[in-house]
């Protein structure tokens, strides 16, 4: 028997002799190895099912009759209460769904939806991206492998050094989105973390064949792309089928398989960075270049865009296209280096492989964390609810009109987790009768002791984060240890702050409507109480929202703010800290404001400048208006700036890039009930043979003519030229000349993007179109 230590990378199972065998993909200094456990059976729980039913339980498929392998009586615990039930074992994981459906007719079936290999990770206390020790017999085979006799987790600070391969495909389409049925792949650009940059081009058959060979020879642990799950991999599969090339890049020689529309590569992680970008709410347009720009990693080495590929390739200027492909691969690689470390840590915390973690929303991540913690204390998980109820949200104080100087924003750090801990809010503490905490307004009661399931986990997460932050103070921010610990504390913060939303999520196993409702009720109470305390100390509360308040007072100093915070700490059981000092700030309405921090940064929250469905010119003018008001305190100049832009549109002095509007296609155009402008633009493109896949950003412009806005929306892929006035548009009948709808851009883009801001300073729509002038003095607080 040998002992081998390494990192756990992935977990799945293989059917050997009719039995499901857990397969662990691990890595040590020698490389990849596989460990097999033959001694683990799929199982789930049932409550309220008679033993006779279990003895005779049978269901069937077309191929076989499915029966239980065995069952055993067990004392189970659910929401802290003891109940009698059974542990039910199946012959194979594929039998579990049928058995679950059959037995759910007779009682309560629990935890029958946990994938077999992930059940193994929970039961054995193992975690992907963490250390693992295996004792067992070494077996033969191409890949070093072991038969598990004993397995255990070895906690490690660092992450494994994964071999990464990033790739991006470029296709040749005469216009619009390429179609795999007819448009060939002309380039696959690759970058690895060994600093290799490889461009595969030439004959398509050779490109695909060389790409498969490259994956096999480089043997990456993780393959990364941007939107490759929905686009590159399906496209590659179609084109490979055309040439009879197997995509057999799995470490066991298997082909890429698609499960639920997701590519799975055996023994390799497959991460789509687009999934991560979709959860970053501050990135409104999810294009690769926008994400890179947001993260500060963007490099620009190409002088063409995607829409130019056909033109340059077909006239022989292939180097420009190759440079563009290289740029995409490098940007994808740099985004991966920025975003993946936190997901490595999340993988370690919730046990699952990184590629699964990147595809999950926060609620599902919390769900898996809770499943692991429940196992440790002998709890079985509830089932998600059949439906969820709504509840009143956070209390919002109406914002004060005008421009304000010398303002402090006080942040109620992790307010909702703090409330949950302070009042022991948890599904297993709800429904208390004696010695309870009672939520204001809603009256829900929670027992004071013992600690509930959520409170114990939240305390653990917060305490771990507190310990890490203490360690960080003693380290250099440039050290590798600091960076690792910082990733860990950020990950803990993300999970901690996700608990509140999880309680009201309709797919949560531990869904608890009263818990979520009570938490927001206490939150509203604390915001109101904080405002009253601040006012009693001479502060003016300008705005309050969810977990922060904005305060000011004549001659306010930081010492004044510190005294206020001390007083709030005396009265309230939550941590409060200064989020930002603003030298100037204005509020447009609830959840919408812009401020200039004391160190000169512009902070914009909830305004259209950060939205994706406005043209570039509207976003630019709004940002300039905000800057002029905050930095120069001159709304008249801001007004003049808007008038200049309106004049420029009228005189035809705008570029195509300035007037294009982008909006995402969230489903097939035929599935939309209401035909929005971007949908009709996509349909016009389809008439010309351009098919936009779901998740594409449709760029379109609005032209003059009859009909509604959608009737006059044309995709930029059909536009050949634009001179500021006239657009040359490809149609079935040839090139048509259409005029830009200047009135639409003035009335529905430019003016709406700034009007709500300028209205706060006394201006009207007529002011923007006319010559009204105002002074700022009457609006300055």
UniProtKB/Swiss-Prot annotation:
One BP term from GO: DNA-templated DNA replication
Entry EC number(s): 2.7.7.7
Catalysed reaction equations from the record: DNA(n) + a 2'-deoxyribonucleoside 5'-triphosphate = DNA(n+1) + diphosphate
Major enzyme class: transferase
The UniProt record lists the keyword DNA-binding: yes
Source superkingdom: Archaea
Pfam hit, one: DNA_pol_B
GO molecular function, a single term: DNA-directed DNA polymerase activity
Sorted UniProt keywords: DNA replication, DNA-binding, DNA-directed DNA polymerase, Nucleotidyltransferase, Transferase
CDD domains for this protein: DNA_polB_B3_exo, POLBc_B3
Keyword DNA-binding attached: yes
Transmembrane segments: none
Record-linked NCBIfam families: pol2 (TIGR00592)
PANTHER family assigned to the protein according to its UniProt record, in alphabetical order: DNA POLYMERASE CATALYTIC SUBUNIT, DNA POLYMERASE DELTA CATALYTIC SUBUNIT
Family from the record: Belongs to the DNA polymerase type-B family.
Protein's recorded name: DNA polymerase
Gene: pol
């Amino acid at each position: 028997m040998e002992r081998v230590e390494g990192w756990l990378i992935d977990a799945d199972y293989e059917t050997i002799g009719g039995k499901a065998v857990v397969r662990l993909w691990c890595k040590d200094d020698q490389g990849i190895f596989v460990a097999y456990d033959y001694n683990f059976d799929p199982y789930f729980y049932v409550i309220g099912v008679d033993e006779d039913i279990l003895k005779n339980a049978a269901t069937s498929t077309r191929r076989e009759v499915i029966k239980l392998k065995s069952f055993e009586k067990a004392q189970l615990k659910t929401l802290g209460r003891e109940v009698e039930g059974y542990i039910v074992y199946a012959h194979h994981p594929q039998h579990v769904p049928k058995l679950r459906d059959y037995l759910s007719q007779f009682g309560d079936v629990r935890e029958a939806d946990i994938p077999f290999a992930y059940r193994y990770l929970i039961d054995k206390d193992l975690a992907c991206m963490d250390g693992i020790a295996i004792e067992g017999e070494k077996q033969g085979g191409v890949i070093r492998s072991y038969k598990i006799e004993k397995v255990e987790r070895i906690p490690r600070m660092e992450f494994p050094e994964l071999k990464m391969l990033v790739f991006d495909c470029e296709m040749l389409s005469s216009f619009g989105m390429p179609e795999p049925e007819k448009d060939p792949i002309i380039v696959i650009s690759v970058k690895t973390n060994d600093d290799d940059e490889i461009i595969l081009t030439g004959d398509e058959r050779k490109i695909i064949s060389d790409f498969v060979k490259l994956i096999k020879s480089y043997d990456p642990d993780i393959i990364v792309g941007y939107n490759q799950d929905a686009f590159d991999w399906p496209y590659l599969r179609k084109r490979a089928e055309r040439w009879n090339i197997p995509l057999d890049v799995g470490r066991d020689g298997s082909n890429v398989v698609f499960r639920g529309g997701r590519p799975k590569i055996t023994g390799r992680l497959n991460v789509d960075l687009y999934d991560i970008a979709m959860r970053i709410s501050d990135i409104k347009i999810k294009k690769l270049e926008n994400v890179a720009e947001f993260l500060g990693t963007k490099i620009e080495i190409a002088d063409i865009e995607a829409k130019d590929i056909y033109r340059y390739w077909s006239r022989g200027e292939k180097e420009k296209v190759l440079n563009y492909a290289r740029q995409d691969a490098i940007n994808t690689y740099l985004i991966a280096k920025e975003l993946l470390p936190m997901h490595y840590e999340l993988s370690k915390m919730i046990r699952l492989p990184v590629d699964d973690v990147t595809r999950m929303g926060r609620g599902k991540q919390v769900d898996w964390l809770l499943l692991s913690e429940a196992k440790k204390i002998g709890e079985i998980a509830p089932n998600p609810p059949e439906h969820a109820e709504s509840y009143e949200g956070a209390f919002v104080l109406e914002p004060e009109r005008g421009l304000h100087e010398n303002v402090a924003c006080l942040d109620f750090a992790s307010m909702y987790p703090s409330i949950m801990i302070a009042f022991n809010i948890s599904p297993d503490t709800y429904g208390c009768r004696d010695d309870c905490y009672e939520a204001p307004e809603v009256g829900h009661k929670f027992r004071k002791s013992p600690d509930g399931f959520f409170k114990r986990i939240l305390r653990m997460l917060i305490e771990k984060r507190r310990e890490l932050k203490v360690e960080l103070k003693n380290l250099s921010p440039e050290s590798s240890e600091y960076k690792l610990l910082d990733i860990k504390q950020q990950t803990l913060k993300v999970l901690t702050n996700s608990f509140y939303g999880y309680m009201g999520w309709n797919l949560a196993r531990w869904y608890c409507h009263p818990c979520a409702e009570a938490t927001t009720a206490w939150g509203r109470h604390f915001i109101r109480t904080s405002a009253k305390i601040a006012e009693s100390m001479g502060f003016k509360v300008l705005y309050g929202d969810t977990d922060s308040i904005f305060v000011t007072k004549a001659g306010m100093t930081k010492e004044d703010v510190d005294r206020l915070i001390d007083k709030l700490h005396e009265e309230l059981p939550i941590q409060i800290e200064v989020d930002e000092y603003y030298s100037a700030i204005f509020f447009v309405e609830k959840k919408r404001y812009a401020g200039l921090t004391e160190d000169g940064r512009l902070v914009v929250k909830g305004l259209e400048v950060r939205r994706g469905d406005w043209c570039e010119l509207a976003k630019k003018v709004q940002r300039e208006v905000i800057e002029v008001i905050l930095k120069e305190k001159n709304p008249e100049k801001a007004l003049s700036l808007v008038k200049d832009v309106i004049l420029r549109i009228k005189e035809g002095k705008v570029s195509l890039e300035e007037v294009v509007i982008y909006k995402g296609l969230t489903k097939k155009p035929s599935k939309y009930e209401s035909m929005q402008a971007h949908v009709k633009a996509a349909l016009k493109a389809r008439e010309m043979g351009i098919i936009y896949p779901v998740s594409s950003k449709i760029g379109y412009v609005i032209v003059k003519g009859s009909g509604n806005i959608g009737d006059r929306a044309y995709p930029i892929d059909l536009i050949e030229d634009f001179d500021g006035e006239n657009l040359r548009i490809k149609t079935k009948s040839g090139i048509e000349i259409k005029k830009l709808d200047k009135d639409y851009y003035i009335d529905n883009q430019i003016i709406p993007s700034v009007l709500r801001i300028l209205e706060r300073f006394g201006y009207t729509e007529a002011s923007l179109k006319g010559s009204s002038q105002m002074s700022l003095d009457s609006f300055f607080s």
